[in-house]
Amino acid sequence: MNSERAYWLAWSQIRGVGPVLLKRIAQHFELLENAWKATAIALSEVDGLGGKLVHQILEQRPTINPANLLDHHQQKNPHFWTPADPEYPLLLWEIPSPPPVLYYLGQVDLADNQGQIPGIGIVGTRYPTEHGSRWTRKISQALAQQQFTVISGLAAGIDAVAHSSCLRAQGRTIAVLGTGLDLIYPPQNKALFEQIATEGLILSEYAAGTKPDRGNFPARNRIIAGLSRAVLVMEAPPKSGALITAKYANDFNRDVFTLPNSPDVKEAHGCLNLIHNGAEIILSEQQLLESLGAIPPVAPEDQPNRSDAKPPNVPNPAQPTPPPMDLDPTLQTLLQTLTSESTSLDQIVSKSGIATGQVSAGLLQLELLGLVSQQPGMRYQRT
């Protein structure tokens, strides 16, 4: 048994310790088993753990047996990850408030979890206009065709359109719920829920039996933003929950894109405010894909013969250090393509001769390894 799983689960039951504080505790003690056995003095060294909360923790710990809790929990919730599990999504662990327990249902793709396939969040109002629905269909299908994973919340409206359009294009989609995985909410999305469970993946930080609650959905939105490389707000009135997702995306250093519409349309007011505050505008599928790092495929007759291609004659200001030998060949090639100077994604694709989808995924992996940094305008450089 992975004992750390039991301690993540046990700590998640401690009242007063939320995801932000629990991540700090985990980082301070390295192992939550150590934290579980820590003295009051040791616990008080964690930023945010005051005397009153430390006292509450010490009172609650004897009432919880981590091993027994894990055994009992797995009977009702057999499929879940904690940050102690290698399958836990890497991008989600990066955020300040990673869920201590993440339940899943459906088809797990470890390439998603490891950040090798870029995920794009699509969110919006439950009551979209024809304009919003039409553009959501177009964008979701275009993303699916370029091998992006579409991530949304399975709500009525924009979420449902995004999921279903992605599936129609035979793409991969992930739904993040604000309930337990044994409850379908809203009920009218039952068929879509079942299709995603068969062909995609459904996630929730809430255990089986958790019913819809007003406070669950803003918390759910941080997971959508955390899993996503970028978030697209397709339509949002001023108080839409989609704007909460956009705020989380900004906080997590994710790109935010939004669809413009007339100021006369109330469903556009939130989007127009995002544009005013610096969100990127969605002008077309092609423009969006280029911004995200995937350009439309070249027709077969226009494909260059890459075996005959020669590298461009460009200055070589400094010889980059050799890449680590344990990187796979694609990552080695990408790293050798980059220098300390900022390079656009299109240039990286051209120089490396690697397909755009692989380039985007590879750059994300290199970012996670700390070998590459992303600059504004989808430009990259070696660190």
Language-model segments: which ranges?
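Short, small/acidic-rich helices and loops at N termini and domain boundaries
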Residues: 1-87, 345, 369-371, 376-383
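Glycine-biased, small-residue-rich flexible motifs in mid-sequence functional cores and linkers
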Residues: 1-4, 83-383
